[in-house]
Amino acid sequence: MFEVDASNVLDYFGDVGRSQWDLLGLSGGALSKSTATELAWGVSNIVIRVDTPVRSFVVKQSREQLRTKIDWFSQLDRIWREVDVLQILQTLLPVGAVPRVLSEDRDNYLFTMEAIDADHRVWKADLLDGVFDSSIAERLAGHLAAIHRGSTGNGEIAERMRDQTVFDELRLDPFYRYVAETCPQFATPLNSLIKRTTQRQDCLVLADFSPKNVLLTSNGPVIVDFETGHYGDPGFDIGFFLSHLLLKTVRHHERVSKAIAPAKRFWSVYRGELSVVPSPEWLAVGRRNPTFERQSIEHLAACMLARVDGKSRVDYLTESWQPDLVRDFCDDLLTGRHSHMIEAIVLLERLLECR
């Protein structure tokens, strides 16, 4: 495999990747006038922006070993799972909500896609800087609801996305299973959650729906990074996404009412979107007994624990008490006695108000 980076990706396009260059409709002369810049999109892939005199695009290539302090590996062909999800999302979301795939190099585990405006902002950076815009959370709630609703009961999507191997390698194992093994006090609820999660086949689940993968442009938010997509438990997306928002709230505890507002707005809009008749069967079951909502709360707790005790830990909870507060909060949620997500969100708000 030709491993690309910002220093050699143009050489790739001039040699083994020349067919990709041609598929992009670019001439040989444009190659010498092009530039390449590596983008900071997570730990599992190499992502490079290429600017040519004609157009800009992004190159993405998977890596077997992820860039984390603790050893973490995943299969290279997960990159094609991302291509599949991108193509499916083109049919479920408004134009421009996700990038369009432009070309694929199967031999080198690489594909190209549309580039986002160069002056975009990453929503994660805004949140870390203390900028809390609930309208972004509202837009994203609508998008996630459209994905979950639109893929429910779709046999073609279910068959295409049924395999959960990458989801296990990049989420269940390093997030849930690792914490269960290293923090025995959480082993029983986490192992139970793993079992129940793998048994669900409800809809398309992104499993990496987070602020770091939301790029803010003048035309609205654009969502990226889909290699963990699969047909499974929608509660994981809810818990994963809200875990990021609530961890940022812990960081900005001195402004808790403003910091927690996007989480409240997201849940309110998402729940409202899926309550429109006819609603997905898995949500209707949740009305009779709050299985979906309760399991979403468990995912919230498990994902927050994973970011303080798992293989991929946040680096922005810098006060010594913050990880312990997260653990105590999650321990409470994993008891199973909370049936409503807003109760869990408000519980954290009250804990932080007491600091």
Language-model region placement:
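Active-site catalytic-loop/activation-segment of kinase and kinase-like phosphoryl-transfer enzymes
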Residues: 1-11, 114, 147-196
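Juxta-kinase regulatory segment immediately upstream of eukaryotic protein kinase catalytic domains
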Residues: 1-34
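Active-site acidic catalytic loop and adjacent metal/ATP-binding pocket
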Residues: 36-59, 191-236
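ATP-binding pocket architecture of kinase catalytic cores
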Residues: 39, 44-155
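Active-site Asp-x-Gly
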Residues: 68-78, 204, 217-265, 320-324
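Active-site activation/catalytic loop segments of kinase-like enzymes and analogous catalytic loops
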Residues: 84, 235-281, 285, 300-318
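ATP/Mg2+ or Mg2+-diphosphate-binding catalytic cores
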Residues: 254-257, 303-355
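Alpha-helical scaffolds flanking conserved acidic
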Residues: 292-302
